[in-house]
Amino acid sequence: VSSLAHIRGRPIIDRGQVFAISHGGMMVSIDLRSGRRIWGKEIGGLSNPWIAGDYIFLLTNDSEVAAISKKSGSIHWVQSLPKFEDPKTKDYPIIWNGPILASDRLIVSSSLGQVLSLSPYDGKILSSLEMSSGISVPPVIAGKTVYFLADNASLVAYR
């Protein structure tokens, strides 16, 4: 882990493996007991990854949601998200938060207030909705409810 710079998301421990991602462009899997690096992948991100089954789901620095194999670090799929509010001029970058997994859907939210649900199996966008305000923090799941804290201090819950 010492070779990783700019770690913003918390490392995740799952079944004897530690997974860490840096904003600087590296994700690694490390054996928890020995400290030996199992694999490394040139991919960067700011948010905490989400682990489910054999995959790690994450947001990349390039506004992509990706599914990566826990075992090998190979990329299973990648889904691009909008990067700019105005794609022609590349003004006003969009900041994405998440992902979280809820009821067979990956959920991400944006600084513009857009919420997307994606298939964890192939990354296809399944649905989209617009909040009344931007969202600057990742959504939270508790029980069967997903909570979003919007920038206008609204707390929105979906089941």
Regions found by a protein language model. Name each.
Residues 28, 66, 116-117, 156:
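WD40 beta-propeller blade core
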Residues 110, 120-159:
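Hydrophilic extracytoplasmic domains
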Residues 1-26, 31:
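Solenoidal tandem-repeat scaffolds enriched in leucines and small polar residues
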Residues 1-13, 36-53, 78-100, 126-143:
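Extracytoplasmic beta-rich repeat domains
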Residues 31-34, 69-72, 119-123, 159:
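Short loop/turn segments that connect beta-strands within beta-propeller blades
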